[in-house]
């Protein structure tokens, strides 16, 4: 089975974990709980082929920025998340 590594990046508090948990568990988390790093796996069908998504939910806080290089080397796909009510989170997305 083909495996894809998806890395979810963006500023702290923009909803990376909420989006990830919605995808994995079909449940929306509405309480903010800062993430350092969480990893999830889900079997999905992409272009008619059953695949395994290995999803890495990353920390957005600046103090964890040193870990980003490792994420960028191992990731095969990236989901850049920003908050529509936080212009700075959109302007800063290029950092990821």
Swiss-Prot record:
SUPFAM superfamilies: P-loop containing nucleoside triphosphate hydrolases. Its EC number is 3.6.5.2. It comes from the Eukaryota. Pfam families: Ras. GO terms for molecular function: G protein activity; GTP binding. One of its GO terms (biological process) is signal transduction. Its main location: membrane. Alternates between an inactive form bound to GDP and an active form bound to GTP. Activated by a guanine nucleotide-exchange factor (GEF) and inactivated by a GTPase-activating protein (GAP). PANTHER family: RAS, DI-RAS, AND RHEB FAMILY MEMBERS OF SMALL GTPASE SUPERFAMILY. This is GTPase HRas. The gene is HRAS.
């Amino acid at each position: 089975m083909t495996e894809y590594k998806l890395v979810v990046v963006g500023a702290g508090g923009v909803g990376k974990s909420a989006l990830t948990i919605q995808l994995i568990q079909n449940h929306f988390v509405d309480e903010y709980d800062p993430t350092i790093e969480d990893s999830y796996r889900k079997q999905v069908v992409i272009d008619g082929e059953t695949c395994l998504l290995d999803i890495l939910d990353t920390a957005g806080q600046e103090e964890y920025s040193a870990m980003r290089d490792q994420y960028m080397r191992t990731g095969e796909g990236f989901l850049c998340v920003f908050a529509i009510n936080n212009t700075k989170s959109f302007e800063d997305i290029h950092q990821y």
